């Protein structure tokens, strides 16, 4: 049984995704959130763009779009999904801060924070694909993107699952100041 139709999911993604950056900017301008939180949100957006744009450019050899988007311009859907990725990233930061009782991981490498962020990113990606794959898009199974699990006839492929792990690991590599 599906909780949401493809059309309902598409409109939810469209509204939430395109409202999120505006909300963060307004909250910052009204001094309700810090510049740090605003920057973390947009860092998450840029993390999302690092795979949303390549997914779009890969085209039909990698995935198919199954539903028309309200604004049918190149990359609009992918940019909107990146705005949602920013929200997912912020939740990961919140979870790491909650479990670790500190935000030091934002300034220096912390393997526990990395684990929390990777776990959250992978779990959220799994839920997103479980609900969106086969309704909004369809990832194509091939030699470089095999199906790792099938649930109710929905084959989830490996590359979308690995994305958050690679992104978070890259983001948290220690750098010299």
Question: Which residues make up each language-model segment?
Answer:
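Hydrophobic alpha-helical transmembrane segments
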Residues: 79-89, 152-168
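Membrane-interface interhelical loops and short amphipathic "cap" helices
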Residues: 1-4, 60-77, 137-152
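Hydrophobic transmembrane alpha-helical segments in integral membrane proteins
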Residues: 1-17
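Hydrophobic alpha-helical membrane-insertion segments
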Residues: 43-48, 115-129
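Internal alpha-helical transmembrane segments of multi-pass membrane proteins
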Residues: 102-122
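Membrane-interface helix-boundary motifs at transmembrane edges
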Residues: 27-39, 102-109
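A generic, lipid-embedded transmembrane alpha helix
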Residues: 44-60
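Conserved small/polar residues in nucleotide/adenosyl-binding loops
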Residues: 169-175
